[in-house]
Curated annotation (Swiss-Prot):
ATP binds at residues 37-44. Its main location: membrane. CDD domains: ABC_Iron-Siderophores_B12_Hemin. Residues 5-241 form the ABC transporter domain. GO terms for cellular component: plasma membrane. This is Hemin import ATP-binding protein HmuV. The gene is hmuV. The keyword Ribonucleoprotein does not apply.
Amino acid sequence: MSGGLKAEAASFALPGATLVDRVDLTITQGELVAIVGPNGAGKSTLLRMLSGDLRPTSGTVSLDGRALADYPPRALAARRAMLAQHTTVSFPFSVEEIVAMGADIDPRKAAPLFDAALRDVGLDHFRHRDITTLSGGEQQRAHFARILVQLWSGEADAGPGLLLLDEPTSSLDIRHQLDLAETARRCARRGTTVIAILHDLNLAARFADRIIVLSGGRIAADGAPAAVLRHELIADVFDVALTVNTDVAGQPFVLPELADDRRAAAHA
């Protein structure tokens, strides 16, 4: 993905509402980018535009200098994989069958990819389980394995691709949130471009190279975590009181300010 992913004045509007408003951004190969913002900020709409799932109503989104709208569906599927916010399967497919849906190569060549993806998400011992019997978090991990296989099978011919994750940790416990973030970071270090919508600002600060803050369909901030996570910005965008601190390695982290703490500080 030598040319990177680029949005130029990209907007998406419905009658009476603009969900994403003239967004300009460039994301280079191997970056791990977190998109954060309050509910209704336009994060999922922007991610779908960056994936090619939604065509901008104005402006353009391009991959390697070519508009996403100009890619044939199969060619685009070989270049990018997206984990949707919610994926429901009503039929009793096994976990391995779900993962296999991501492959577009000879099944004999795909088998090692299945094994690696299932190990990465911690479901190798569940490969023969009916996916409808799994918990919501386990199902989310199975679908993450599926898109990893899609990504890896496409990269075999097309080179490093694009991995898009829409709130991938929403159903996961702490351990598996960290496991998923580590897997995403390994993908980025191998050259894959990773874009993830996250609500956990500390997870974003710990794993992302760059944080984009979206508010009202527009980019409110874009940069390294330490530059973006500022008290004033968080208060303005999220309408909440948080304290921004820095750990011994210089990484920012945020903690909530409780009402009692604010009252005590005011009278100190």
